[in-house]
Structure formats: C-alpha cells, structure tokens
Amino acid sequence: LFATVPLRLSRPHHHDTINILTVCYFKSIMENKNHQQENFKSTYQSLVNSARILFVEKGYQAVSIDEISGKALVTKGAFYHHFKNKKQLLSACYKQQLIMIDAYITTKTDLTNGWSALESIFEHYLDYIIDNNKNLIPIQEVMPIIGWNELEKISLEYITGKVNAIVSKLIQENQLKAYDDDVLKNLLNGWFMHIAIHAKNLKELADKKGQFIAIYRGFLLSLKDK
C-alpha cells in the first residue's frame, strides 16, 4: 500500500503580509478620499440649489447665510468652507442658471450651421426665459452684486461664448459684411441681454415673441455679405 505523506501548508512570507496590509491601507485611504469628495460636491450643490430657490423667492438682499445653510441642511461652517461670502454664492447660482439654459439650447441647436445656429440659439433662449421665468434670478439683482466683469466672465463660458464663436467662424468664412468683430459680437449678445433684463415682463415677452424673432432675423440678414 502507498505510504501516507503528511501535507505541509506553506506559510505566507512576512513581506507578503506587509504587501497585503499596504494594499488594504491605501485602498481604505482612496475610498475615504472619494467619500469626502462626494460629500464636498453634495454639500456645494445643496448650498447652490437652496440659495437659488431663496434668491428667486425673496430676493438676494432678503436672504441670510443662516437661512441658506438651514435650507441646505448644513452648518454655517460648511457654508464658509465652500464660499467666502454670499456674493460668491450668488455667482455660483447665476452660473448654474446659465448652465441650465445652455444645456436646453444645446440639445435643440445644430451649432455647426452658423446662420441657422444664431437664429436657433436666440429663439430657444427666448422660449426658455418665457417658460422658466418664475425660477430665474433676475439679472438686475445679479449684476450690481457681482459686477459686470464677473457677469461677462461667466456668460462667456456659455451662451455668449457660443455666439462669439459662431460670429468668428462666419467672419473667417467671409459670410459677414466687413464690420468690426467686437462690435458685431456685442450687438448680437445685446439681444440676449435685452431679453434677460425684461425677463420679469413675462406677458410682454410672450405676446411679442413673434416680433422679437422677426426683428432679430431681419437684423441677421442685414449682416450677411451677399
């Protein structure tokens, strides 16, 4: 009969144990870091969402940091961890507002077709303002607080930037009359500013929507280099 040979289980080497512990340690650190980042983003977004609702309902001046923190269910210390002051938070709220408008326009506009895109951006911008009027912070409240330079800087990331890019492309393709490009960009973006300023006059915007669009299209046609 066969002789029975006892099995000897190999014991892990000391350095293998250290490697396993090291991997577990760094994995724990990364998981904790990811969790902290998620909490950071969540708290930031909660503050912005809460502030935007309160600014729309009551106006910027009537809302306190305590009230914003309370609505966001965070401490006042958490507020100051994310924002230096209420002014900085207003900038973040305005930026979020433009992000939502920009997303709406982008899904409905073919930005590769210059002339058509300029028409579409304006028309869908007008639609969004009319449909979401009651949920927007008036630009008249934003501009005096954050200042024109900050307002323009934020706007350039979204609608204003898109309009400027299209105008630059049309100029390169010699589709525009020989006007100064800065003048053209400022005038075109002035249409959007006009709508934003008069956003609270909802009835007038809705009733005269067709006229706004017709005049805007006529203005665009006058710029074409035939």
Regions found by a protein language model. Name each.
Residues H124-Y125, K177-H198, Q211-F219:
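Hydrophobic alpha-helical segments that form the core
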Residues L90-Q97, Y104:
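Alpha-helical DNA-contacting segments of helix-turn-helix folds
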Residues A92, T106-D131, K185-L188:
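Hydrophobic alpha-helical connector segments
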Residues L73-F83:
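Short hydrophobic/aromatic patch on the recognition helix
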Residues I129-N149, I197:
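Amphipathic alpha-helical segments used for helix-helix packing
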Residues R11-K58, A62-V74, Q88:
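Basic, helix-initiating cap at the start of DNA-binding domains
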Residues I99, W148-E173, D182-N186, G210, ...:
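Amphipathic alpha-helical packing segments from all-alpha helical-bundle domains
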